[in-house]
Amino acid sequence: MELLNQKKIASLTEEIGADNVPVLLEIFLSELESYLKVLCDATYSDKLVYLKDISHALKSSAASFGADALCHFAVEIDTRAKEGDALDETQDVVAMIDRLHQTQQAYLSWQANGF
């Protein structure tokens, strides 16, 4: 699974216009940063609640921005949570933090190279 799906990014660029991509990308990157902060700063008992909320929110935004690996993981966590499957505070939260960070870094690199 691709970290960033270039075809989806190109499609988004075509739909909204190349001038709008940097603005929306900044908003998305800001969201990723806030999710990272929430998960890293949350108390032990709150981490799973935030993980569920963040996963639900990321399903559509990550898909829209072509963040396929992040979207796939968010869908997996959201589905497991809705089905009542136990989420692991350590493993699942750490995996989400890792995917958020990887996606953020990939977009920052892509942005630095002029989109």
UniProtKB/Swiss-Prot annotation:
The modification Phosphohistidine is found at H56. GO terms for biological process: phosphorelay signal transduction system. Keywords: Phosphoprotein, Two-component regulatory system. It comes from the Bacteria. Residues 17-107 form the HPt domain. Pfam families: Hpt (PF01627). GO terms for molecular function: protein kinase activity. Phosphorelay protein which receives a sensory signal from a sensor kinase and transmit it to LuxO. At low cell density, a phosphoryl group is transferred from the sensor kinase, probably on His-56 and this phosphoryl group is further transferred to LuxO. Monomer. This is Phosphorelay protein LuxU. It comes from Vibrio vulnificus (strain YJ016). The lineage of its organism: Bacteria, Pseudomonadati, Pseudomonadota, Gammaproteobacteria, Vibrionales.
